[in-house]
């Protein structure tokens, strides 16, 4: 089931949230990550996950390698296709640590904390969809829990162990 939603943050606001964390990504990987984020915000499509333990509405897009090259404004070459595959791997397998020592209050001001909050996660959850010849047809891409929290209308439920 697909629904359409309105995000409370636009792409530029999300991009600035990521820039604050100074992610250890090369410029090409960042360009690809931002192209995907921009498409998630632009598409406003969500997939209903009724049995989800986190949130039932997960933004999801389906992109082929060619789509990602176009969105990232990269030439359609074998080298750039390989670059996209490597970036998708890095964004969906490697874990990044986000550390906070301040929190943003409702009035927009910041408050310094007496402690640090560290969050480690991937950026995207990515599933490869293959055609009948066993070639990748497209990727189903969903933001991770951390990225969902950046959208601000999402809340993520964590299990208490």
Per-segment meaning from a language model:
Residues 1-161:
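Charged, alpha-helix-forming regions
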């Amino acid at each position: 089931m697909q629904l359409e939603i309105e995000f409370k943050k636009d792409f530029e606001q999300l991009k600035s949230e990521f820039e604050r964390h100074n992610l250890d990504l090369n410029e090409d990987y960042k360009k690809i990550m931002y192209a995907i984020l921009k498409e998630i915000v632009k598409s406003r499509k969500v997939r209903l996950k009724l049995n989800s333990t986190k949130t039932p509405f997960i933004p999801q897009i389906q992109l082929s390698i060619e789509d990602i090259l176009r969105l990232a404004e990269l030439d359609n070459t074998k080298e750039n296709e390989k670059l996209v595959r490597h970036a998708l791997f890095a964004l969906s397998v490697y874990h990044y640590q986000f550390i906070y020592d301040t929190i943003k209050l409702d009035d927009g001001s910041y408050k310094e904390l007496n402690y640090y909050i560290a969050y480690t996660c991937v950026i995207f959850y990515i599933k490869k969809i293959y055609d009948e010849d066993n070639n990748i047809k497209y990727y189903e891409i969903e933001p991770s829990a951390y990225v969902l929290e950046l959208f601000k209308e999402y809340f993520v439920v964590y299990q208490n162990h």
